[in-house]
Amino acid sequence: EADPDLAPKLGNAHGFAHGFAKCDPGCGAALHWHETEEVFMPLDGKWSIYWRDGEEEREVFLEAGDTVSVPIGIYRGFKNVSDKPATLQFIVGGPDTGKVHWHPSVIDAARKTGLEVDDNGLLVEIE
């Protein structure tokens, strides 16, 4: 049995949360926004980070060691543009990844496949 006194004395993160997106070539996340900032940092591969500036879509390409921060309320997405699977680290403000707000074009495309957005911003099958 594990000794509880040997457990690390680290608390939960406060003020931010992070995770990793491991994606095959051509895959990533569609346009969405959070009620927090979001920072992207590739661990490997080459990534397209794209966002909406009004009606115009803008894009930057990142590789390992690069970083970009996207402000609150800006639609953003990412895609692995490498020729092999790659990993992207993301950090968001707040203690969780925050509710996702999908771009209307993403919701329209999802509905055509039988999906709908639930109260948490998740795309779910319509029953």
Located regions from the model:
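Short acidic-glycine-tyrosine-enriched beta hairpin
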Residues: 53-72
